[in-house]
């Protein structure tokens, strides 16, 4: 996005500002391409939805599962026409795009064929709680374009929609990654600083992130839960508190939903037996025994010990789920 030329930025801005463009293309897409699609088949497939607090390994997990070549996901090449992947498949405005290190500067590269969290835009455009059939149609059209039967989504906002998604796709699997609370909180704080600088220097990136519903960090940051004790985002305690609020909430909701929801420990992904356990849960063959690069960085020495102890106890609870 930071390397888009003027024409690319104008086209994206038009789609960002005038929702009627993508909405109209979607209606045409359905008229032409939804024929001969069986939505019942899509509804009952074992799709996978990855959703958690950012910096928990969601993208690494997405790429790991996607390499299995069994799933369809929206990709960077589908931007900005993500409502009409079949209809606009011949439009290529991002030629000569070589793999680049993503703005997070976290050793993860992306290309036009990299999967990414773009279904948030569609879900934000509809009253999704009453639109099960519409989302099934949307996913069906993506599956048609990529000639796959199962959909793979990484969207950190989907945690708040798990009940809707379970109702829409009753056989779907949900992965909620988590990470050592101090390491994850430090990473969140560092990315907030990083993206605040990027947003200040490049307003197009800010508009792009707002369009995609990426409000995790930067100038457009929105807390996942209302802060109780800590309000300063430059204080590690703000992020630890958000970590505790986030995982406490979803642990209480889904820790007993063991057939459909699984909390995934980032640090354990280096263990091949843990990968095999994940493969069994997803009922798929994750044959690529990826060597995960689990990073640990020095953390601030000063933090709220009571808050941190609460976080560690919750981390252990999540780890002990079978």
PLM feature segments, named:
Residues 1-41, 196-322:
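PAPS-dependent sulfotransferases, especially Golgi type II membrane carbohydrate sulfotransferases
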Residues 44-47:
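Pre-Walker A (Motif I) flank of P-loop NTPase domains
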Residues 50:
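Hydrophobic anchor at the beta1->P-loop junction of P-loop NTPases
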Residues 53:
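P-loop (Walker A) phosphate-binding loop of NTP-binding proteins
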Residues 59-72:
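A conserved segment at the C-terminal end of the G1
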Residues 77-152, 216, 220-225:
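PAPS-dependent sulfation machinery
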Residues 154-156, 165-190:
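Conserved phosphate-donor/acceptor-positioning beta-strand/loop module used by diverse small-molecule
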Residues 161-168, 277:
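A short acidic, amphipathic alpha-helical/loop segment
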């Amino acid at each position: 996005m930071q390397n888009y030329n003027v024409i690319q930025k104008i086209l994206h801005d038009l789609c960002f500002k005038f929702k009627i463009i993508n909405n109209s293309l979607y209606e045409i897409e359905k008229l032409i391409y939804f024929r001969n699609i069986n939505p019942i088949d899509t509804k009952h497939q074992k799709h996978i939805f990855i959703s958690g607090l950012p910096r928990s390994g969601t993208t690494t997990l997405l790429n790991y599962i996607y390499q299995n070549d069994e799933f369809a996901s929206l990709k960077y090449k589908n931007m900005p026409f993500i409502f009409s992947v079949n209809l606009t498949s011949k439009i290529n405005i991002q030629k000569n795009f070589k793999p680049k290190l993503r703005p997070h500067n976290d050793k993860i590269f992306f290309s036009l064929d990299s999967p990414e969290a773009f279904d948030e835009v569609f879900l934000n455009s509809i009253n999704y709680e009453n639109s099960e059939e519409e989302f099934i149609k949307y996913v069906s059209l993506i599956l048609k374009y990529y000639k796959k039967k199962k959909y793979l989504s990484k969207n950190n906002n989907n945690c708040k929609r798990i009940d809707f998604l379970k109702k829409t796709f009753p056989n779907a699997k949900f992965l909620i990654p988590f990470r050592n609370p101090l390491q994850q909180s430090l990473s969140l704080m560092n990315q907030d600083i990083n993206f605040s600088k990027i947003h200040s220097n490049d307003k197009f990136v800010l508009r792009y992130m707002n369009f995609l519903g990426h409000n995790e960090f930067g100038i457009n940051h929105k807390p996942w839960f209302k802060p109780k004790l800590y309000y300063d985002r430059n204080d590690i305690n703000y992020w630890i508190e958000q970590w505790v609020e986030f995982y406490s909430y979803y642990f209480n909701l889904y820790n007993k939903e063991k057939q459909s929801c699984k909390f995934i420990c980032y640090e354990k992904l280096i263990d091949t037996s843990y990968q095999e356990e994940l493969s069994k849960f997803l009922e798929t063959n994750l044959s690529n025994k990826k060597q995960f690069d689990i990073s640990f960085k020095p953390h601030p020495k000063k933090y709220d010990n009571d808050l941190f102890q609460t976080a560690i106890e919750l981390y252990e609870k999540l780890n002990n789920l079978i």
